[in-house]
Amino acid sequence: MEKKTGTTTVGIKVKDGVVLAADTQASLDHMVETLNIKKIIPITDRIAITTAGSVGDVQMLARYLEAEARYYYFTWGRPMTTKAMANLLSNILNENRWFPYLVQIIIGGYVDEPTIANLDPFGGLIFDDYTATGSGTPFAIAVLEEGYREDLTIEEAKELAIRAVRAAGRRDVYTGSKKVQVVTITKDGMKEEFVV
């Protein structure tokens, strides 16, 4: 029996910060295992990643990034930027391209500036204003393309991200739409909430 899993995660960058959003459903083949999984993982108090793919691979990569961020801070006396962490993660993924981590990750943060990046399992790295990962990507991207503007406020970006995840949940059977995990990161820090 072929096992299929899915999810939808999105990231949006605006002038005041970044918004990450994800559904909270975990599915395996035709079964919903839980409606309460967190798919956005804080790495520092200013950087987080979203998860699409192998849970074990993402958890291991998150632990590695947390350790690297602490080491960087102790060595240099300042936090690692989101761009630096994205490049580090890209290198880690690329070094393992022959035995890849089965993940697609959005990294978002606000250290010196708001930053969003999308990484594929082989280390391909794209910095953008908005992005999506997971099985519901085509549906989420359609909503993001229609609604994104450079002058969005952080609250407007949050509403757009929620709309994108919910649109994917209505059309992609592996994406849940009942509850959305949302993380906003601004110069003032990180805030997590769950929207029902």
Swiss-Prot record:
Regulation: The formation of the proteasomal ATPase PAN-20S proteasome complex, via the docking of the C-termini of PAN into the intersubunit pockets in the alpha-rings, triggers opening of the gate for substrate entry. Interconversion between the open-gate and close-gate conformations leads to a dynamic regulation of the 20S proteasome proteolysis activity.
Pfam families for this protein: Proteasome
Enzyme Commission number(s): 3.4.25.1
Cell compartment(s), UniProt: Cytoplasm
EC class name: hydrolase
CDD domains associated with the record: proteasome_beta_archeal
Primary site of residence: cytoplasm
Gene Ontology CC entries for this record: cytoplasm; proteasome core complex, beta-subunit complex
Active site location: 7 (nucleophile)
Keywords, comma-separated and alphabetical: Autocatalytic cleavage, Cytoplasm, Hydrolase, Protease, Proteasome, Threonine protease, Zymogen
Propeptide cleavage-removed residue intervals: 1-6
MF terms (GO), sorted A to Z: threonine-type endopeptidase activity
GO BP terms: proteasomal protein catabolic process
Catalytic activity: Cleavage of peptide bonds with very broad specificity
PANTHER family in the cross-refs: ATP-DEPENDENT PROTEASE SUBUNIT HSLV, METALLOPROTEASE TLDD
Family classification: Belongs to the peptidase T1B family.
Subunit-level organization: The 20S proteasome core is composed of 14 alpha and 14 beta subunits that assemble into four stacked heptameric rings, resulting in a barrel-shaped structure. The two inner rings, each composed of seven catalytic beta subunits, are sandwiched by two outer rings, each composed of seven alpha subunits. The catalytic chamber with the active sites is on the inside of the barrel. Has a gated structure, the ends of the cylinder being occluded by the N-termini of the alpha-subunits. Is capped at one or both ends by the proteasome regulatory ATPase, PAN.
Function: Component of the proteasome core, a large protease complex with broad specificity involved in protein degradation.
Designated name of the protein: Proteasome subunit beta 1
Gene name of the encoded protein: psmB1
